[in-house]
Amino acid sequence: ERGLRFLLKESVQAPRMGVGFNGRYDVRDWGHIEALETLLRMQQLDRVPTDLETPVKNLITTLIKTLEENEIKGGGWNYSRSRRGASPASPFMTAPAVLALFRARELGYDIDTGIIERALDTIENARLESGAVQYSTNPERATGEGFEALEGACARMAVSELALSLGGRSSLDRVRFSVKSFFDHWKWLERRRAQTGTHNPPFYIAPYYFFYGHLHVARAIELLPKEEQEKARLQLLKLLWQVRDPEGTWNDRVFPRSACYGTAMTLLALKSPATPLPAEFKPVEIKKPLPKPKEENEKAENEKAEKSEPVSL
């Protein structure tokens, strides 16, 4: 409950966590996304104390509005933007945001479906022929190398395909390939775990994507056929236990404090089989009224003409 009260107090507290974007690098929307997902899951689990139900609902509405207001022109979200003009979306930030909005919509919150559609567009446009997903959506400048090689993209492919799949824009084969790519190229993630620097060559993998990737591949596994899930879960479990610290925590950075983040992401990954995915996104179809029969139209026209004729006195 103490953690919940902290979220209620700080999640959108200005200026540090308010609406907007400061400078070129602003990670506040990561906090908004994770706070939204956390509160929605607490509602689903019926874990919100009675006296906090209204504040939680109000904060969820505010977080949704904040994400909507922070949308990049053209769709999606990114924590790194240009000061000189339009910026591309970040698929690995946009996908978790979309998943949280899917869950909010499932629970009855009002969501602008246009924002979801635009976000899905940016993820889909970042998908390359190889199955890799660009670091930032820019299909006109795709190279398929470095960031965009399967090795460089393997930690964001699963979350991208998961969001696209629930949005009706992916397939089982694509999801399966994203999970396979994570395992096939895991060694490149491990080489960057708990290392200095950020986007170092050859594949420019930053250390802090390590446990992020494990969490979202765990979620994507839930879309696989039942007979494939158990094998994939065991494979993931072995990898997670392989990188567990002697203290019993998980950390993908060089800072002791980040063990909190790594451990939390790992625990969420381990709980994925018991955590329902958001409901599939189905845009509300606005049905146009059926045309009136010909005789009704003629009758209406005649009545209209009669009313418009001048009255003789």
Where are these regions (language model features)?
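TPR/TPR-like (Sel1-like) alpha-helical repeat modules
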Residues: 240-241
